UniProtKB/Swiss-Prot annotation:
This is Aegyptin-like protein. Anticoagulant protein that modulates blood feeding of female mosquitoes on vertebrate hosts. Female salivary gland (at protein level). Disulfide bonds join 211-265, 233-243. One of its GO terms (biological process) is suppression of blood coagulation in another organism. Residues 1-19 form the signal peptide. Residues 24-45, 53-126 have a biased composition (Acidic residues). GO terms for molecular function: IgE binding; toxin activity. Keywords: Allergen, Blood coagulation cascade inhibiting toxin, Disulfide bond, Hemostasis impairing toxin, IgE-binding protein, Secreted, Signal, Toxin. Residues 141-151 have a biased composition (Gly residues). One of its GO terms (cellular component) is extracellular region.
């Protein structure tokens, strides 16, 4: 039993010794690392610091470069703005000069237009005065032809003959519309047109004036005869149209001799 008790005691002592806490000095010695491990750690830390420092230096250099680039860009933009402003200013001056030139041209054009209009107005006034003077001369010639009858003016002769025909061959006083239309057609085709054609080239009315003295009375006689015949026809219970056709055919045969006499007279005296 004693040996067992001693062995038990030994184990108890060992357990007590093992269960006791370690002193701080011993723990520090245990925790101390070997020089190689420490140098390795320091080397790694130095490399990390070096990398950090290099990155920081690189960042500072990049920031400085960016600032310098920004300054140059700003200077370039300012310079470009100044150049652009100068160009704009020059452009404005140029535009102003062109504008002045255009205004000057416009004023010149207006002046030329005004002068042209004045010249045209003067020309038109001159033409108007010439026409008036010409018209006055023609009027004088016509007046002279009417008074003396010796002017060689075919136009004046034509107007005088037409006036005589209109005066001596009127049928406006005939009441029947059918008879009036029929006799008017006869006078137009048998008297007016042939006489006008006969005197178209004659210049002196005084030479042929005597050819128309009896024309008015001769035509009036034919018209009166046809009116009487028309009334007699209506008493026979014929229609107004039928009676007018009878007068139309009869008057044509009576007017032709009158026209032939006038044309013969004009032809003989007008030469």
């Amino acid at each position: 039993m004693k040996p067992l008790a001693k062995l038990f005691m030994v184990f108890c002592l060992i357990g007590i010794v093992l269960s006791r806490p370690m002193p701080e000095g011993e723990e520090g010695e245990g925790e101390e690392e070997s020089p190689d491990d420490a140098s390795g750690d320091e080397t790694e830390g130095g490399e990390e610091k070096t990398d950090d420092g290099a990155s920081e230096d690189g960042g500072e250099e990049e920031s400085k470069a960016d600032e310098e680039d920004g300054g140059e860009n700003a200077d370039g933009e300012d310079a470009g703005g100044d150049d652009a402003g100068g160009e704009n200013a020059d452009g404005e001056n140029t535009d102003g000069e062109n504008t002045d030139g255009e205004n000057t041209d416009g004023e010149n054009a207006d002046g030329e237009d005004a002068e042209g209009s004045k010249d045209e107005g003067d020309d038109s006034e001159g033409d108007g005065s010439k026409e008036e003077s010409t018209g006055g001369d023609e009027g004088g010639d016509n007046a002279g032809g009417g008074e003396g009858g010796g002017e060689n003016d075919p136009v004046n002769t034509y107007h005088k003959v037409v006036a005589i025909l209109d005066k001596d061959t009127k049928v406006d006083n005939i009441q029947s519309e059918y008879l009036r239309s029929a006799l008017n057609n006869d006078l137009q085709s048998e008297v007016r047109n042939p006489v006008v054609e006969a005197i178209s080239r004659l210049g002196s009315f005084s030479k042929i004036e005597g050819c128309f003295k009896s024309m008015g009375s001769d035509v009036k006689k034919v018209i009166d005869e046809e009116q009487k015949a028309f009334k007699d026809c209506m008493t026979k219970k014929k229609s107004e149209y039928e009676c007018s056709e009878d007068s139309f055919a009869s008057a044509k045969g009576k007017l032709s001799p009158i026209t032939s006499k006038i044309k013969s007279c004009v032809s003989s005296k007008g030469q």
